[in-house]
A protein has these predicted regions:
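N-terminal Rossmann-like NAD(P)+-binding domain of SDR-like oxidoreductases, especially those catalyzing
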Residues: 1-124, 164
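NAD(P)-dependent short-chain dehydrogenase/reductase
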Residues: 78-80, 103-171
Length: 171
């Protein structure tokens, strides 16, 4: 089934037809750099689409697990991160949309009793990985004998999570 989460009628029809006990929302426009040039896509998919899912859960399902992002930690310099750390300084529109999801889920939980769990995934890698992510870019550069392009002078530190670990943790 292919469905656009910004299409509320189609989404609500799916909820009505399927009678979900739990919803796991992994739909989002991902990527920090892309959000700079395509902000509308992020607001429509990550905010409006998520709102539609919350509205459908409000009326048709009371449990929602959803993907947030490590990018909500923004300018937080403490390492390692903790789920109680402040997340009020996003550094990209993508991060702001994911923080918005967390706030919206909290409100729907408080107002309507929906059980919500947001999972702050760190960079996910593995088979079928996104072609714009560093593991794929680095592997392609190495196999093609090209130099690896680094950002921030190569001083960046990044946590990666293997897709199978994400699946186990989410389920």
């Amino acid at each position: 089934l292919k469905l656009d989460i910004t299409d509320y009628s189609a989404l609500e029809n799916l909820f009505l037809c399927e009678g979900f006990d739990v919803v796991c929302n992994l739909a989002a426009q991902a990527g920090v750099r892309y959000s700079i040039d395509h902000p509308r896509s992020y607001v429509e998919n990550n905010v409006v689409g998520f709102f539609n899912i919350l509205e459908c859960c409000r009326y048709h399902c009371n449990t929602l697990v959803y993907a947030s992002s490590s990018s909500v930690y923004g300018g937080n310099t403490k390492a390692p991160f903790c789920e109680d750390d402040k997340v009020d300084n996003p550094k990209s529109l993508y991060a702001a949309t994911k923080k918005s999801n967390e706030l919206m889920a909290h409100v729907y939980s408080s107002l309507y009793g929906i059980h919500t769990t947001g999972l702050r995934y760190f960079t996910v890698y593995g088979p079928w990985g996104r072609p714009d992510m560093s593991p794929v870019l680095f592997a392609n550069a190495i196999t093609e004998g090209r130099p690896i392009r680094l950002f921030n002078g190569g001083d960046m530190i990044r946590d990666f999570t293997y897709i199978d670990d994400i699946i186990r943790g989410t389920l």
